[in-house]
A protein has these predicted regions:
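Helix-loop junctions at membrane interfaces in 12-TM secondary transporters
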Residues: 96-108
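A membrane-interface helix-boundary motif in multi-pass transporters
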Residues: 159-179
């Protein structure tokens, strides 16, 4: 795995995107793990309402993934992901200031749209930035970053929740920060340059062969 990281470091935009992915995906993982608890303990959702919300969010996630595909074709993956992260930020802000069930329904469906889109576009970008002969290796890094984020995000939320005496709204600020920082880091990723580097490396490998 260390060798794979060393190889990935040769591709500036791939490495920068993996760092970006690790940050914003920490926010995504936190929402996936703790959204239900937030809805119940902060907004007062009962079990039945929560189940219905989760079912609807799954539908909006599918819609988000579908729309994401069309946006990537028209705009590119990086602009599409930027839009997705803005939606995440707005959704988390909506949840942060939610005071009634309707607020959480709005936030939840925005989360669904963003979740479906961000999962799809993240993998697509790693594929674009990976030389064909190393695609499997670098997609393995993508998976590793996702797994690490699944630990970092909820852990940060839990730590702040503990330090704030169980204040979920304060804890949610860490989740919001992940998306804001992720969006800022994404501005350093150049999709055209990253694709060109992957293609160029592949051509060099072919010539060497």
């Amino acid at each position: 795995m260390a060798h794979t990281f060393k190889e990935a470091a040769r591709f500036r935009d791939l490495l920068w995107f993996l760092i970006t992915l690790g940050i914003y995906q920490s926010g995504v993982s936190t929402v996936v793990v703790l959204a239900a608890i937030y809805a119940q303990e902060v907004i007062g959702f009962d079990t039945q309402s929560l189940i219905i919300l989760i079912m609807v969010v799954n539908v909006t996630a599918a819609v988000g993934a579908f729309v994401c595909g069309h946006l990537q074709d028209r705009m590119g993956s990086v602009p599409t992901l930027a839009i997705t992260l803005v939606i995440w930020i707005i959704a988390v802000l909506a949840a942060l200031f939610a005071t009634m069930s309707l607020d959480m329904w709005i936030a939840g469906n925005m989360i669904g749209l963003a979740m479906g889109a961000s999962q799809a576009v993240g993998r697509a970008l790693v594929s674009k930035f990976s030389p064909s002969e190393r695609a499997g290796e670098f997609l393995g890094l993508w998976g590793l970053v996702n797994r690490l984020s699944a630990i970092l995000g909820p852990l940060s939320y839990g730590l702040i929740n503990y330090l704030s005496n169980g204040n979920h709204r304060t804890s949610l600020l860490s989740t919001l920060a992940f998306f804001i920082v992720g969006l800022l880091l994404l501005s350093k990723v150049n999709e055209s340059r990253g694709k060109a580097a992957a293609i160029s490396s592949g051509a060099l490998m072919d010539d060497a062969g």
